Regions:
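Sec-dependent signal peptide recognition
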Residues: 2-9
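C-terminal motif of bacterial Sec signal peptides marking the signal peptidase cleavage site
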Residues: 13-15
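Extracellular/periplasmic metallocenter environments
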Residues: 19, 38-54, 65-67, 110-147
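Active-site loop-to-helix "anion-binding N-cap" substructures in soluble metabolic enzymes
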Residues: 53-57, 71-74
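Beta-strand cores of secreted/periplasmic/IMS beta-sandwich domains, seen most often
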Residues: 70-93, 118-125, 129
Length: 147
């Protein structure tokens, strides 16, 4: 219990600290947005297939709840993102282009091409990326990474 209290106090101190030059609310500008998960260290998205036409995602991203066929998702640079894939016959890739095959992969992504496992990624630069089935051209969605 003592270790838990110490950890809780440390988390409060770290969470309340701020970088120099900010607005007094930490490095994340205060916006009173209930979906702002700036203190969350990771995002988990469940990925299944809907036939050969769509990936079905559910979970949360920076904008809140995510659910449906091939939804667009948004993250910030440095977020820890885990796609929990259960999609037999549909190899799951994170790419720089919405392309078939195994080319155009984002570097630094673990477990690319899985049909049953976790694909993890910590985006290092802002931009537009894609989650893609390497076999079916209709199975893809847009990933937006912001600073």
């Amino acid at each position: 219990m003592k270790k838990f209290k110490t950890l809780l106090i440390m988390l409060l101190i770290v969470g309340c600290s701020s970088d120099s030059g900010d607005d007094g609310y930490g490095s994340n500008n205060y916006n009173n947005n209930d979906n702002d998960q700036s203190s969350v260290t990771g995002y988990n998205l469940s990925v299944t297939s809907n036939g050969m036409s769509d990936y079905k995602l559910s979970g949360k991203d920076r904008n809140g709840n995510v659910s449906g066929n091939d939804p667009s998702v948004t993250f910030k640079v440095g977020d820890q993102v885990t796609f929990m894939v259960t999609a037999s016959g549909h190899p799951f890739y994170l790419k720089t282009k919405a392309s078939l095959g195994t080319g155009d992969q984002i570097s630094g992504v673990s477990n690319q091409g899985t049909v049953n496992g976790n694909v993890t990624w910590k985006p290092s630069s802002a931009g537009t990326y894609y989650y893609v089935c390497s076999k079916h051209s209709n199975m893809f969605g847009v990933i937006t990474v912001v600073n």
